[in-house]
Amino acid sequence: MKRDVRILLLGEPKVGKTSLIMSLVGEEFPEQVPLRAEEITIPADVTPEKVPTHIVDYSENEQTDEVLREEIVKANVVCVVYDVTQEETIDKIRTKWIPLVNGGAEKGSKIPIILVGNKSDLRSGSSMETILPIMNQFSEIETCVECSAKNLKNISELFYYAQKAVLHPTAPLYDPEDKQLKAQCVRALSRIFSISDQDNDHILSDAELNCFQKLCFGNPLAPQALEDVKTVVWKNTSDGVQDNGLTLNGFLFLNTLFIQRGRHETTWTILRKFGYDDTLELTDDYLYPVLRVSVGCTTELNHLGHQFLLKLFEKYDEDKDSALSPAELKNLFSVLPYMPWSSTVYSNIPLTDDCYISQHGYLCQWMLLAYLDVHRCLEHLGYLGYPILMEQECQTSAITVTREKALDLDNRQTQRTVFLCKVIGPRGTGKTDFLRAFLQRSTERSDRDPGAPSIYAINTVSIANQDKYLILEEVDVETEFLKAADAACDVACLMYDVSDPDSFNYCASIYKQHYMDSGIPCVVLGSKADLVEVKQHHGMSPSEFCYKHRLPSPLHFSALLTHTHTHIYSKLTWAAMYPHLNGSDMSSTSFWLRVTLGATIAAMLGFALYRAFSRHK
């Protein structure tokens, strides 16, 4: 909504433009009227809409045509004043003033016009019969007000309508020639209907209508008022009411009726509550609320985000099979102007046996998005109606920004639940199979997977009876060069092919170049463990290398034995959670034992504190 309103008064000489302004300000008819009134500014606190309003007078005798053109450009609304007793001043509306204001403007970008019939005290009848054909000819005319500067009749109403034409414009909502809502307005209201239809039955029940009414206007409708609304819709539409509720067509008809009856502000209140601006686009403030993430911090969905997303999942899981089919997923995202999840999502997350997105996989994908691109995540939550349905100021309440990693290291514990593991190794070592195995997919099933290839896989790993999210990112490079940004992560998995004698050279080089002094935990993984292990051409064997650099002994993986490798993903998660134990001992057994003991002690301490707190209460 505009922050201020600029009203320009035009019309033939002696029609009373200046008198109208002075009567409004002085609240009495002026005895002496100057040729032109100075610009008046009405403070926000004395206007009905609480917006500062500037009123500008124009006089042909004092101002040039160039000044007039400049004032028209600056104006938000133009009041064309005519004398109800002088027919020629009415004719000038059509032949002079409207062409002057909007002659070169395209449809939809015209300045709104209010027709003002002054000196109604000098005429017994109304001029509306003469004015109506003009109003029908020019769609930019919002309304016509007959008033009297002398009797102060309709003076405040005149400026209220002018203000309203700017703050609640008709043009973006309604086409007066076609007598129907514009396509952009239909799209916006359809999204609002979909968000408000909380059970996805395509009908707004009484409970949903009251929820909607309270959200937009602060109070629920009285039962009789609710019935009256439905009766009006039922009488005027063939499909507006169904099962005692309002359909989308009924909802659209109701808003059309508001506009046709001059109650544009009702529809605008609804639109603005759901984040729309004057062009019927969602505002940047709504879609992209400010969220500051310091260096070393990460972002995760919190309990509010989970709660909202689970409600959304249940709403669109129409067959209640705890999975979203492609059609159900498309419906879920129908309130967005584009499909936000590409086919790679099916390669990122665990799927059902039918290759549908399970509830668990759905939450995994949202966690992945929140971690990798939190601002895109906020945008998606905004489109889906998170602030409205969760009654929150904005989407940032769904996100937790974790504390800096350096503080976690100092405290030797973390409250984070999402960790990133870079899987690094030369091409052909089996990194993709390692990611697929994390999602419990066999190599035989790869032909059935609907997803496009992805460099990410996310799943949960149970650590001390708590689920943590582990993101695996495949880093595939042709040479031994790896940028520092590519190396940053919570834990690095350096993968080599046990059957390729040159494979480990790459891992050793990457470790020395990026991880040896980084403090990032590293786990060496020998892939293709079902094949015969050959001696590596590196100066040391992988085990000797790990011993020398105080790394845990190498782990082994085979894509043919996916069900036996759960412990590998657990150990990667452990290492990410407790980086301070990295390199604390050369023995693999001792390393994992220290990690396990650390986690157990932390869990026991937390339980003891909980019991002590409970007793105190």
Swiss-Prot record:
GTP 2 binds at G428, G430, K431, T432, K528, D530. Mg(2+) 1 binds at T18, D57. GO terms for molecular function: calcium ion binding; GTP binding; GTPase activity. GO terms for cellular component: mitochondrial outer membrane; mitochondrion. Mg(2+) 2 binds at T432, E474. Residues 2-168, 416-578 form the Miro domain. It holds the Pfam family EF_assoc_1. GO terms for biological process: cellular homeostasis; mitochondrial outer membrane permeabilization; mitochondrion organization; mitochondrion transport along microtubule. The chain crosses the membrane at residues 591-613. Residues 614-617 are mitochondrial intermembrane. It is a single-pass type IV membrane protein. It catalyses: GTP + H2O = GDP + phosphate + H(+); ATP + H2O = ADP + phosphate + H(+); UTP + H2O = UDP + phosphate + H(+). Keywords: Calcium, GTP-binding, Hydrolase, Magnesium, Membrane, Metal-binding, Mitochondrion, Mitochondrion outer membrane, Nucleotide-binding, Repeat, Transmembrane, Transmembrane helix. Its EC number is 3.6.5.-. The keyword ATP-binding does not apply. It is found in: Mitochondrion outer membrane. CDD domains: Miro1 (cd01893), Miro2 (cd01892). Homodimer. Atypical mitochondrial nucleoside-triphosphatase (NTPase) involved in mitochondrial trafficking. Probably involved in control of anterograde transport of mitochondria and their subcellular distribution. Can hydrolyze GTP, ATP and UTP. PANTHER family: EF-HAND CALCIUM-BINDING DOMAIN-CONTAINING PROTEIN 7. This is Mitochondrial Rho GTPase 2. It comes from Danio rerio (Zebrafish). The lineage of its organism: Eukaryota, Metazoa, Chordata, Craniata, Vertebrata. The gene is rhot2.
